[in-house]
Curated annotation (Swiss-Prot):
Gene name tied to this protein: GTE8
NET domain boundaries: 320-402
Coiled-coil portions: 566-639
Name of this protein: Transcription factor GTE8
Compositional bias of kind Polar residues: 30-43, 120-130, 146-168, 649-663
Length: 813
């Protein structure tokens, strides 16, 4: 029994009831609000809605009127909280229903139950067996198609009525997503896809700079998970993530690296397959609904009596909202890669690409005809995607036109017959990976622009010798596929064990032929690899040795073909032996690379030590030279000081120097003629040198030197022939004396030299020829005496004065 109660202000409200099933949608609930009077009106004029317990909503939802007039504040808050909670739960149900409608394979159609706080439950499930009855609109009319058949309606995410045909519009999108899933499975089954099946483990692979270089990591495992969970709303998002996976691999690894080559091969394979899906994408157009007509409804009439202006108006059927296609996005890595590709092909671009670039150049029409200025960062994503497609088409056409590919004959392992690798079927192996620094050998097929027929033929080709039974074909295609399968079994069985070895042999043969041609021309091309790359390649081969050997294993016979058991046993033994040898070789290469690296590190350390030692020696030698230079500077300065002291002594006045002669007779004047002015002292004394006195030698008494006051000043002296020798003999002043002979018995007495005061002043002196020798013989004054005969009496030697500072002849210290 449904109770009715009026809201304050003339409003009536309905609560949620358990909804019944509706076609193509989940649970639905509504809140109907009727405005019967003005809220500002003071009169309590209200118009009630007469509801019968048996009457239901056209969608099977019962109504209940809640009276807010008698509710307390807490009850109102509780009601508001319940309504908000139920609204959130309804949104979740609608979201799940929409997700189920867009991707029914990912979301199951099982019932989803949402619990309400009132204890009621809403069961939403999709049922095609029961359709809702016709609903009344306005004055008893229902919506019908133009052809007379009734049409069902659903509630969409916006709460409006949408046609159930909307589920049919997503069928092409679902088909395209299935094709994307098929393409992903083909990439997943490729021999090179094992590198991209899981996210990059930075710690395990020891590459800490990976996240610095790659800002948006992506892998095929994540793409597969997103595709299964319905994350991608369009195939464009799927293609962007797949391209990002291979772009990251080729960006982080150098061009000669194994992972770079694998990513390039898979990227080309994906682009070739993606063109078929891209052609099937729907254009961006709005899909309109057919017009509807209103017909009278005799089965059900509304029991609502309200003025026409206040009636609940049914929203007109809204056109189905088609989601806008996701615009393709170009990452920074893809932009830089496209720029490098454009620069490499700038000299050979065709006319239509040049016109496209001129149309979208940065400066508009201001540039000359022979100039092209393109800023990759300024162009939009749509323009860059179009440019990339044009470049891809040009490159593929260019590769298709190249006919100078030399066939390489390879001898099979089982020795059956030689085969031509360029004539064999490529299947999914459009490009083969060649170990080392050589580029992969491309086996290009016909152009991929042939349409859907090429896709069907490619799908018909077996990838792992067992997928042909899944594709229903006509009788001719079945026979052709069986024949191709048998041919593939014959070739793959003999080639799978040594696929990479055969490619190595082929590359070596090509290198040998190139070297022979180069020797004739004098040009030999060499591509030496650095030791670091070799070491890294050896480590990778050793790390993934099991996977490499597993990829080279010979597959067992399939499709019911039985071989000779003895031959199979021998082949297995040979395979095990080859596996052991190959693993041992890879380990030996890794060890050799490790030894080479250690030796290089040791040599580098020794060289660094020698360089440090040489630097220390140079520093020591420089310090030694600086010390010697400093010592020489000190010695020069000291010598200059000695010279300055000597110059000062030699230029000093005689009054400042001590003199024994001045002490003897400081007041005696010296005549200017014939006198030796020695500044009152011995020149050796001026230099600080004095004669050393012997202790044993008797010092002779100094002769009495007449004082100047005792000399007669009145005695006339002849001016001619007189020798003024001063006080004593000049030789004696120099410390030179006559040596006495020891053989003489008796030295003659020296004549007594009269003193000046004893000389008679009245004695006449001849003016001519007289020698004024100051009272004595000048020879005697010089120390020369006449030798006396033995018979004669030897005169006594005169007393020779001896200065305190005089010594014997030749005794100078």
């Amino acid at each position: 029994m449904v109770e009715s109660a009026a809201f304050p202000g003339g409003y009536y409200r309905n609560t949620f009831e358990a909804p019944e099933e509706s076609e193509g949608s989940g649970s639905s609930a509504q809140i109907d609000t009727e405005v019967t009077a003005s809220e500002n009106s003071s009169t309590p004029a209200r118009k009630c809605i007469m509801l019968n317990s048996n009457d239901e909503d056209p969608y099977g939802v019962q109504r209940q009127v809640i009276s807010l007039y008698n509710m307390s504040q807490s009850e109102r808050k509780d009601l508001i909280y319940r309504l908000k909670l139920e609204l959130e739960q309804t949104k979740i149900v609608l979201k799940n229903a929409e997700l189920q409608r867009m991707n029914p394979a990912a979301v199951s159609s099982t019932s989803d139950r949402v619990g309400f706080s009132t204890g009621q439950k809403i069961s939403s499930r999709v049922s095609n067996s029961k359709k809702p009855s016709d609903f009344a609109v306005g004055s008893g009319k229902k919506v019908r198609h133009q052809n007379g058949t009734s049409r069902g309606w659903n509630r969409g995410t916006s709460g409006k009525f949408e046609s159930s045909k909307e589920t049919m519009t997503s069928t092409p999108n679902i088909t395209l997503m299935k094709q994307c899933d098929t393409l992903l499975r083909k990439l997943w089954s490729h021999p090179h896809s094992w590198v991209f099946q899981a996210p990059v483990d930075v710690v395990k692979l020891n590459i800490p700079d990976y996240l610095t270089t790659i800002k948006h990591p992506m892998d095929l495992g994540t793409v597969k998970k997103n595709l299964a969970s319905g994350v991608y709303s369009s195939p464009h998002e799927f293609a962007a993530d797949v391209r990002l996976t291979f772009t990251n691999a080729m960006t982080y690894n150098p061009p000669g690296h194994d992972v770079h080559i694998m990513g390039d091969i898979l990227s080309k394979l994906f682009e070739a397959r993606w063109k078929t899906i891209k052609k099937k994408l729907p254009p961006c157009s709005m899909q309109t609904l057919p017009a509807v007509t209103l017909e009278p409804n005799d089965e059900r009439k509304a029991a609502i009596s309200v003025p026409p202006a206040k009636k609940r108006k049914m929203a007109s059927p809204v056109r189905e909202s088609v989601p806008e296609p996701v615009k393709p996005l170009m990452t920074e890595v893809e932009r830089h890669r496209l720029g490098r590709q454009l620069e490499s092909l700038l000299d050979e671009l065709p006319a239509h690409i040049i016109d496209f670039l001129k149309k979208h150049n940065s400066n508009g029409g201001e540039i000359a005809e022979d100039e092209i200025e393109i800023d990759i960062d300024v162009l939009s994503d749509e323009v860059l995607v179009t440019l990339r497609n044009l470049l891809d088409e040009y490159i593929q056409n260019k590769e298709a036109k190249q006919t100078n590919v030399e066939p390489c004959e390879i001898e099979l392992i089982n020795g059956s017959r030689p085969s031509n690798s360029s004539l064999q079927r490529g299947n999914e192996m459009a490009d083969e990976y060649v170990d080392g620094n050589e580029p992969p050998i491309s086996r290009s097929s016909s152009d991929s622009d042939s349409g859907s027929s090429e896709d069907q033929s490619d799908d018909a080709k077996p990838m792992v010798q067992g997928d042909s039974s899944k594709m229903p074909e006509t009788a001719n295609s079945e026979a052709q596929r069986d024949e191709n399968t048998r041919i593939d079994d014959l070739f793959v069985g003999s080639q799978s064990t040594g696929a990479l070895e055969q490619m190595d042999i082929c590359s070596q043969q090509k290198l040998s032929s190139d070297e022979s041609d180069g020797q004739h021309e004098g040009n030999i091309l060499e591509t030496p690899a650095s030791s670091e790359k070799r070491y890294r390649a050896a480590l990778l081969k050793n790390r993934f040795a099991d996977i490499i050997l597993k990829a080279r294993e010979k597959p067992l016979p399939q499709n019911g073909i039985k071989g000779d058991p003895e031959r199979l046993r021998k082949e297995r033994e040979e395979l095990v032996l080859q596996k052991k040898k190959e693993k041992a070789r890879l380990q030996a290469e890794a060890e050799a690379a490790e030894d080479a690296r250690r030796q290089a590190e040791a040599e580098a350390a020794a060289e660094a030590a020698a360089e440090a030692k040489r630097k220390r020696e140079l520093e020591r030698e420089a310090a030694r030279q600086a010390l010697l230079k400093m010592e020489k500077t000190v010695e020069i300065n000291e010598n200059s000081r000695f010279l300055e002291d000597l110059e000062m002594l030699s230029s000093s006045a005689p009054e400042q120097l001590p003199s024994s002669a001045e002490e003897t007779s400081p007041e005696r004047p010296l005549d200017a003629l014939g006198s030796f002015n020695l500044r009152g002292s011995n020149p050796l004394e001026q230099l600080g040198l004095y004669m050393k006195q012997d202790d044993d030698e008797e010092e002779p008494e100094a002769p009495a030197v007449p004082k100047p006051d005792e000399t007669s000043t009145e005695r006339p002296l002849d001016a001619l022939g007189s020798f003024k020798l001063g006080e004593c003999n000049p030789l004696e002043q120099l410390g030179l004396y006559m040596k006495q002979d020891d053989g003489e018995e008796e030295e003659p007495e020296a004549p007594v030299v009269p003193k000046p005061n004893e000389t008679s002043l009245e004695r006449p002196v001849d003016a001519f020829g007289s020698f004024n020798l100051k009272g004595s013989n000048p020879l005697e004054q010089l120390g020369l005496y006449m030798k006396q005969d033995d018979d004669e009496e030897e005169p006594e030697a005169p007393a020779v004065p001896n200065l305190a500072n005089d010594v014997e002849e030749g005794e100078i210290d």
